[in-house]
Amino acid sequence: MRILLAEQQHACYARLLAEAAPDLDIVGGDDIAELAGQAGQCAIWLGQPDLLAGLLRRCPAPAWMQSTWAGITPLLAEGLPRDYRLTRAVGVFGQVMAEYMLTYLLAHERRLLERLASQGECVWNDRPGGTLQGRTVLIVGVGEIGQRVAEFLAPFGVSLLGIASSARAQPPFAEVATLAQLPNLVERADHVLNLLPDTPATHDLYDAALLGRFKPGALFINAGRGVSVVDVDLVEALQAGRLGGAVLDVCREEPLPAEHPFWTTPGLLLTGHSAAPTSPIGMTRLFLDNLDAYQANAPMQGTVDFQRGY
């Protein structure tokens, strides 16, 4: 069976696939023009959505496509076909995302960046740090990744609130509500963690009105999608001191232009879309599991609903 592999890390994936499934014929690379000549001979494509979207503009769609990213926004672009099965990466990002969130929550509570700045100025900073114990953390987007983040945070003694597509009981959350209730829940949260996907309903969500409902001094972390935030409104909220800080892993435009105000906004930290890199080993395992399911005409993990966008 021939598999088209469109990935910047194609050599790594090809090696892992050859070791785990030597019967597969892998056609790999990261040059769309070169791959386009082979795409028609491959019923299955594996790779990163930006490269796969480029191939879809040149070639007929495959029978099945496996994304190596959790987000599949490039494949939802206007004019691209949707008459194929698409699965996205699931089950491979939970722990690394939880570690990312925990890193910056603790850094904020313990005033890490403030102490680094003080050291650079030879100032003895003895301001007491905080603790996660007793804090209320709101996770906006409690799918597979959000659930894993919650499980990591629960032992720290936090109270967990969540936003999902439907209100439901979902341990370890004390409450899970719908997006319509977000303004009410942010008023109760000491820390707000955004993990929402890119859908029409999540664009410009964090605007001046919503940011104005945040608890004074709250920390905002966005590792979902940059389009969820109205940039100018977040800058204004930070400059006015209404928020305790913001950590942004994602932005509307990446890389962020040098003239963008995020670079110089006080209390804002940029982490360059590094929160949850794909593990090639975990991704290879997921692909092979889905390949078995595909061949057996069984349900596959991470199947995308094109209407919902995830």
Task: Give each language-model segment a name.
Residues T87-Y100, E114-R115, E254-Y310:
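C-terminal helix-to-coil terminal segments
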Residues Q95, Q147, A208:
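Residues forming the Rossmann-fold NAD(P)(H) cofactor-binding site
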Residues P155-P172:
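NAD(P)-binding Rossmann-fold cofactor-contacting core
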Residues A167-P261:
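Rossmann-like adenosine-cofactor binding region
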Residues A36-G40, L56-C59, L132, P183-E187, ...:
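A short, aliphatic-rich alpha-helical micro-motif
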Residues M1-I44:
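N-terminal glycine-/charge-rich "phosphate-binding" loop or analogous flexible N-terminal tail
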Residues E114-R148, E175:
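Glycine-rich NAD(P)-binding loop of Rossmann-like domains
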Residues Q41-L116:
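Phosphate/diphosphate ligand-binding glycine-rich loop within oxidoreductases
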